[in-house]
């Protein structure tokens, strides 16, 4: 039942249900609806059609590993651990599903590529020295190359073709069977009648089995770099073993310290080329001109040094002459300064006494003012008390007179 206080208000429809209507949505909902509508109708947004059945079939046996994850808010600078994704599929820990040979091959190939990149980076940064560790980057590079070559040699997809997934459990047997099949086909193959044999390197082209040799330039480059690094290491060890203390003053050994054998040979070859008979005359002429210039420079330098020394001696003599005139008056100046020092000390003490006297005088004057004020108050109080006493005596005399009558 409606509240009776609203019964007599105008504009109320009685005996009808209450209806609340509005023309538009609230402002926040309007803005959100406009943004969604603009995004749906915009030509810049790519609309991707997702097949839910295909997505379900792809991810129905997959699980998300939440071990060690932390998506909580942080107040420190350290980052939280979220989901990680890689370039290949790796089974998570604790799933209980055995890794297939194809997945294992992809994982090993990716790890070897990462190891190769790290070794190449270490080779470019680590300096070669005689006191290296046992597992050097060069040795590690050789091991990585051998491991990668072994993995490439077991590349089952290229060797066995599209049927590799069926025979992954026995790759050696599958490879042997495939080779035997190819040999049998090659033996039993004959040229069809009425057709000429295919062109090839020999007359019996169909009676041979053709094998393809695939060359990897990056692998050859990596092996060559590893060999060069190993050679430089051995040369460094050899130089460290046969090297003796070189004379730093010897002009033939200038610039040879710390250089490798090839650089040393090139430097020595350049120095030997300078000793050619055809260039000795030119070198001698240049040396003569340089020697003449050096002699002229030495003469000018000696003259400049003599003039500089003479000017310094003259300045020193003038200073000594001035000092002679000042030395006679110096004791008197010192005595006068000592007397002035004593006078200044006495003046400072007198100033301190005056300051103390001034402070004391101010204190005394303040005390006198306080005492004067107190005396005035006492005198005033005494006058008031005397007046009161006189009044009391007067009243007492009057009473005594009344009583005596």
From Swiss-Prot:
Which Pfam family name is an example for this entry?
Dynamitin
Membrane topology category: Peripheral membrane protein
Q: Where in the cell is it found?
A: Cytoplasm, Cytoskeleton, Microtubule organizing center, Centrosome; Membrane; Cytoplasm, Cytoskeleton
Key words of the record: Coiled coil, Cytoplasm, Cytoskeleton, Dynein, Membrane, Microtubule
Q: Does the keyword Cytoplasm apply?
A: yes
For this record, the Gene Ontology CC terms, alphabetical, are: centrosome; cytoplasm; dynactin complex; dynein complex; membrane; microtubule; vesicle
Q: What is its main location?
A: cytoplasm
Q: Which residues form a coiled coil?
A: 101-134, 383-403
Family matches, as InterPro entries: Dynamitin (IPR028133)
Q: Where are the transmembrane segments?
A: none
GO terms of biological process kind: axis elongation; microtubule-based process
Q: Does the keyword Protease apply?
A: no
Q: What ranges does the record give for the region Disordered, renumbered to this chain? A: 1-24, 186-207
The record's similarity note reads: Belongs to the dynactin subunit 2 family.
Function, as annotated, reads: Part of the dynactin complex that activates the molecular motor dynein for ultra-processive transport along microtubules. In the dynactin soulder domain, binds the ACTR1A filament and acts as a molecular ruler to determine the length. Modulates cytoplasmic dynein binding to an organelle, and plays a role in prometaphase chromosome alignment and spindle organization during mitosis. Involved in anchoring microtubules to centrosomes.
Q: How does it assemble?
A: Subunit of dynactin, a multiprotein complex part of a tripartite complex with dynein and a adapter, such as BICDL1, BICD2 or HOOK3. The dynactin complex is built around ACTR1A/ACTB filament and consists of an actin-related filament composed of a shoulder domain, a pointed end and a barbed end. Its length is defined by its flexible shoulder domain. The soulder is composed of 2 DCTN1 subunits, 4 DCTN2 and 2 DCTN3.
Q: Could you tell me what this protein is called?
A: Dynactin subunit 2
């Amino acid at each position: 039942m409606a509240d009776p206080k609203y019964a007599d208000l105008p504009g109320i429809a009685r005996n009808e249900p209450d209806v609340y209507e509005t023309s538009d949505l609230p402002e926040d909902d309007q803005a959100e609806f406009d943004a969604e509508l603009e995004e749906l109708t915009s030509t810049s947004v790519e609309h991707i059609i997702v097949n839910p059945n295909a997505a379900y079939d792809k991810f129905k046996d997959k699980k998300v590993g939440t071990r060690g994850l932390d998506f909580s808010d942080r107040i420190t600078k350290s980052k939280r651990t979220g989901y990680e994704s890689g370039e290949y599929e790796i089974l998570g820990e604790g799933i209980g599903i055995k890794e297939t040979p194809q997945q294992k091959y992809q994982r090993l190939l990716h790890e070897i590529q990462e190891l190769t990149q790290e070794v190449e980076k270490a080779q470019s940064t680590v300096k070669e020295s005689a006191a290296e560790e046992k597992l050097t980057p060069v040795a590690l590079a050789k091991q990585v190359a051998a491991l990668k070559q072994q993995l490439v040699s077991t590349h089952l997809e290229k060797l066995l073709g599209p049927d590799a997934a069926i025979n992954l459990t026995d790759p050696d047997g599958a490879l042997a069977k495939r080779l035997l099949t190819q040999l049998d086909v090659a033996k039993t193959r004959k040229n069809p009648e009425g057709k000429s044999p295919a062109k090839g390197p020999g007359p019996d082209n169909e009676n041979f089995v053709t094998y393809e040799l695939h060359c990897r330039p990056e692998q050859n480059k990596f092996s060559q770099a590893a060999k060069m690094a190993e050679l430089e290491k051995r040369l460094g060890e050899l130089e460290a073993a046969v090297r003796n203390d070189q004379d730093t003053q010897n002009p033939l050994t200038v610039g040879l310290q710390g250089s490798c054998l090839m650089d040393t040979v090139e430097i020595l070859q350049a120095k030997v080329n300078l000793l050619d008979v055809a260039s000795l005359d030119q070198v001698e002429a240049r040396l003569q001109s340089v020697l003449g210039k050096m002699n002229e420079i030495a003469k000018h330098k000696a003259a400049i040094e003599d003039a500089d020394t003479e000017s310094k001696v003259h300045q020193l003599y003038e200073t000594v002459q001035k000092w002679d005139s000042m030395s006679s008056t110096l004791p008197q100046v010192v005595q006068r300064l000592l007397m002035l020092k004593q006078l200044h000390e006495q003046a400072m003490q007198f100033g301190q006494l005056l300051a103390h006297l001034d402070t004391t005088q101010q204190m005394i004057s303040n005390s006198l003012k306080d005492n004067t004020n107190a005396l005035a108050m006492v005198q005033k109080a005494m006058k008031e008390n005397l007046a009161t006493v006189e009044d009391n005596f007067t009243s007492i005399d009057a009473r005594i007179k009344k009583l005596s009558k």
